[in-house]
Amino acid sequence: MALKAKKSLSAIFRFAMRNAAKTAEVEAKAVAGDSLISDTGPVSMSLIPDFLSSLKSPEDSSNIGQDFGEPALAGQVSSALDVKSIGYNLLRERNGEKVFPKNVLETLDLLSRKGCSSQKPKQASRGRMLTENYQNKQSEIMEKLAKGCVRKLGTETMFEVLTKMGKEAGEKEYNAMTKLCIQRARRSNDAEYALDQIGKAIEHLKEMRQLGFSIGEGAYGPFFKYLVDMEMVAEFQILKDFIKEACPESCGRLVYYEMLLWIQVNDEEKIHKLCNKVDDSGLSLSILQEYYLVALCEKDSKENFQKLLEIVDITTVSSPDALKSIFGYLGKSLLESVAMKLLWELRDCRKDGVETVSNLIFSYATCIPNSTVEDAIFKFNKLHEELDIVPSSTSYENLVSYLCGSNEVVTALDIVENMCEAGLVISANILHSLLQAIEQILEFNLVQRIYSIMSNKSVKPNSETFRKSINLCIRIKDFEGAYNMLGNLKNFNLAPNSSMYNSIMAGYFREKKVNSALKVLKEMKEADVKPDSVTFSYLINYCGEEATIAKYYKEMKQAGVEVNKHVYMSLVKAYASCGQFEKAKQVLMDLEVPAKDHNELKSVLISALASNGNITEALSIYEEMKKLRCPVEPKAILSLIENSDSNAELGTLVELTHELRDSKFWIDGFFKIIVFAVRNNRSSSILDLLEQTKNHLSKDDVGVEYWFEEVFKSIAETESSDVKVGLDLVSFMKEELELCPSRKCLDFLLHACVNAKDKQSALLVWEEYQCAELPYNVINYLRMYQVLVAAGDSKSAEAIVSKIPNDDKDVKCIIKESRIVFTPKLKKKKKKSKQKGLSLQAK
């Protein structure tokens, strides 16, 4: 921010905070008549945001007119939450006029409750319902929803919405609004906009105090950090005095922020003064020093940190988080001798010293810079040995989580197995970290090691552990292992549930083993496990016959199972797969379908029609939704691209990708177009498309690397392999994206050279392996041998064969067959000429 703007902000800030306790009448008078004198001169109040009175959003109902205020507000809420009603077009703009539906607020219960959007017991989505952190996820969703509303409606309008819906804004809402204002000010390069946001944050703090709310760190913390980063010392002191008066219990945290400030402005005198003196806050010296140490760690003030640490009694530090920060910073600073001295002190003086020290060793070992996972484990074990203690279960749990986060799952499994041998308790959290990491790295076969670990008596799994394990078994088609998991439940006094059986059933359906899937349904009933909506969704989706669809739907209704969104989706997909496109569309006409699910179901209908050959109807529904400004799910757009007619224009497909806001979905859609171009002989346009979008592609994106492999795979699979475009893609990846082609990319391209019998291109690809430092393997040698034989270069072909190990019978067989298949056939021209001569003589 420019110096002048910063000084203006300082003047405004002082004025606002010093008048925080004034009444609304005095504040209004000050706003009407006063002007501010800053270091840069007078600041006109007409140019400053109205900090000290209610701030109206440009889209507030008062700006539209009193008669139309209520529907306008309802429309804004509907738009923000993407709530749609059947028979209405929400927030349409025609000829500049906004049209809003009636009774939108009646259908919108979400913000007036804390968790549920219906008075009936809600059948939650599969993932949320079945996990332990359901409440946390709901909290995250509500926070995300609140942020979306604020972004689209504005802060003040959002508060007004809450009031109109019978929910007063509470501490959480004010905290969120204050934090959002500071975030906006921090991100903005516009001084005037930043001033406006700071003013709103001040107003929120004042309102919280006037309403009697406790002003916690969630509200003032981001504000203080912003002032620290802006090095606004005077403003910091004003805010500090305000918070100290409004919330006396916050004194401990205020000294932490004060230390951050003096470190930021590099005021060594103030830093030393704080480190050596008790202030008037009533806090003990040890507590103050604890906060100061954390601040010094955060700001990387190594010299002052060491000086303070020399006079601090580490055994008086009570906060586990503070100790974690201190020892993490010791590791970061490579101060092992200091760390060992403190660890010995903690080990010898505390009742829980051994466990505390073990946890701190983990913090130290994993924060050492430029160290590998192996280095961290070595240091972890070494320090435990030197201190003559055994790692605690908690430190092991932290270490396993750290390894899983680093994708070192095999190493994490080794450690857990060692824990079993040592008789340490294996908590459900450890198992969940392992299972999540296995799914993340796609090494599903590692779940078999989890199964052997769970046979140990020291393991404490729960139902969710078994559900996740069964799901991973199904991913590798290990149905026997999944059933073994089910049988093992009784050993832990756990009962099977529908989600476990559903995973097995879905696996059988995906493998087209319908009888086995139906057998699972029978086993559920025998185990007294009632089928739920997910069960019936699978049965309907995969039954494949119109009569069976009706049968399962009727059975579900008779069982009293709620028909939720997923069931309607299954009905749409099932009818479409049977070719009953009209019935698929009629599902959406059911009056019981909730209005909030209507657009999502339309998106499913688009996907179902497109994937079952009715691309024309799918596009028609898509265009209709766009005209009505209804959101279309990314998966539906991807399905339209993937199932497009071979004559579709590339420009039309590119326009579809413009609707994909999320970068992951956009990358999927864009590369599906590239694959489409390869498969439909449109290769000439590929490089142009890549050049136009190269700024949106990152070499660090795993999705980009994966999709380039898919493109090369398509090149290898086409009948007339376009090797040249493959070589051009390699050059583009290296030069424009600085991305080295993976082994899969080069393997597919070499295979394309075999199909095209293109020796020169194959030699270029062969060089790329060396550039990428990829060693040649048997498959590479065989492919190159086939190209050389096809080119008639027998000498080079034999040289390649000599490098292939001859102890594999299958490889020998492939070489023999390749020689027969790829050796060029000699044309018998002489024989043809003789036959021609004989025919002439006969004439």
From Swiss-Prot:
Coiled-coil zones: none
Subcellular location per the Swiss-Prot or TrEMBL entry: Mitochondrion
Spans of repeat PPR: 392-426, 427-461, 462-496, 497-531, 532-562, 564-594, 598-632
GO cellular component: mitochondrion
Main location: mitochondrion
Sorted UniProt keywords: Mitochondrion, Repeat, Transit peptide
Alphabetical list of InterPro entries matching this protein: Pentatricopeptide_rpt (IPR002885), TPR-like_helical_dom_sf (IPR011990)
Family statement drawn from the similarity comment of this UniProt entry: Belongs to the PPR family. P subfamily.
NCBIfam families xref list: PPR (TIGR00756)
Protein name (database record): Pentatricopeptide repeat-containing protein At4g21880, mitochondrial
